[in-house]
Amino acid sequence: ASDVYKRQRMIFVTDMDVDDVSYREVVEELTELYGKRIAPLHFPIREDGKFVGYVNVVKQAGRRYIDKAGKEECPVPDYLTEYLEKYHETLMESVAETSEEFMDRYFEGDTFSVAEISAAIATNVQDGSIVPVCMGSPVNLRGVSNLLDDICGYFPSPSGRSCNGIAQKTNEIFEANYD
């Protein structure tokens, strides 16, 4: 339906607090289904099977949860650097495809700033060329603020979109106003 109606989309993988949930397997399955459009923006940090933090692919940085609402910076664990490199490279390929200038810079081995990456993600989400993947545990309020931040940062405002309806009694077409 998102392709038919030209709607942007994002995938949020839940239950990261459950021991046997594998975020990497979900991302691999999504990639098999949708190809290179899948772009993981975060992935979990686990210790002793527990969901204790996440890696931000855009910023290439780790965050550890310190309580229900707080988090602090932490190094990316060694066992996750391979996945960070893989997901970051996939994201950089998507960023490069945003413009000729970015494509040239990518092939010259140049790096992109966080602001450039974020702007390119927003452009690619809006045209449907990538589908961001986030994760968390809504039950424990982990990852939900990242999801909301990503929606606000990468998706177009609904106020910039017109929507028409048909009045049931008169069959007249009208423009819906969200204000």
Features from the language model and the residues they span:
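Structural and coupling elements of P-loop NTPases
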Residues: 2-179
